[in-house]
């Protein structure tokens, strides 16, 4: 048996087409275009690639974007001042600060400084708290994208045992909340978890987001499981995920590829959040 591939490229394109049509309709009615401010501190190569992709997508969809490429020695105070300015800028609906930030900057303080209704990354404690209380508004982009991918499988998530490998604030923790909201019984594993293999083997739905190439052997996958691989790792010029893809796809019912799985969805859901924030600003 070979798993059905869950294509993020295909779904992301459909979502972006819908966003483009919505924006075109608003502009045709005389409204301004949505505005997204993208802040990059330093010159981390991976961050530059991600930011470039986000800016390109904005241009394709008709979203007005402002770029702030700041030197690595930018102070926390300077960054907070810029965020405050953007919070009060009427033409900006979303503010994105590309992570990771330099060590001398307190990431938590920066995230908390962004107005919750402009927090299109979905990282602000207010937005995470709303998800926790089952009233989500702006949701963390990667977990939100994963939920959209799961919808395309047609599988009923109610009662499925979902196992998440990785407990980061960006993916693992909000992913657990999304799956809980989706009706799953959720197990979160992390660096202190004992006997990871035992947990993975029980997963009807496995989400792996660690950033270690081929961390999960294919033989650990439960028959007919759904496998969502969030990891993106470069080995010898090739991109691979956190799951041993070939072996896993022989046991799973559905699996996301790397690349072309979760990655494109993260950017698509960022644009979706930007549209949502915009709609709330023009129709409060």
From Swiss-Prot:
EC number: 1.5.1.5, 3.5.4.9
One matching Pfam family: THF_DHG_CYH
Keyword check for Hydrolase: yes
GO cellular component: cytosol
Catalytic reactions on record: (6R)-5,10-methylene-5,6,7,8-tetrahydrofolate + NADP(+) = (6R)-5,10-methenyltetrahydrofolate + NADPH; (6R)-5,10-methenyltetrahydrofolate + H2O = (6R)-10-formyltetrahydrofolate + H(+)
SUPFAM superfamilies: Aminoacid dehydrogenase-like, N-terminal domain (SSF53223), NAD(P)-binding Rossmann-fold domains (SSF51735)
Protein origin, superkingdom: Bacteria
Keyword annotations from UniProtKB, A to Z: Amino-acid biosynthesis, Histidine biosynthesis, Hydrolase, Methionine biosynthesis, Multifunctional enzyme, NADP, One-carbon metabolism, Oxidoreductase, Purine biosynthesis
Transcription regulation in keyword set: no
Alphabetized GO MF terms: methenyltetrahydrofolate cyclohydrolase activity; methylenetetrahydrofolate dehydrogenase (NADP+) activity
Binding annotation for NADP(+): 166-168, 232
Protein's GO biological process: L-histidine biosynthetic process; methionine biosynthetic process; purine nucleotide biosynthetic process; tetrahydrofolate interconversion
NCBIfam families: PRK10792.1, PRK14186.1
HAMAP family from the UniProt entry: THF_DHG_CYH (MF_01576)
Assembly information from the UniProt record: Homodimer.
Functional description taken from the UniProt entry: Catalyzes the oxidation of 5,10-methylenetetrahydrofolate to 5,10-methenyltetrahydrofolate and then the hydrolysis of 5,10-methenyltetrahydrofolate to 10-formyltetrahydrofolate.
Family statement: Belongs to the tetrahydrofolate dehydrogenase/cyclohydrolase family.
Protein name: Bifunctional protein FolD
Organism from which the protein derives: Glaesserella parasuis serovar 5 (strain SH0165) (Haemophilus parasuis)
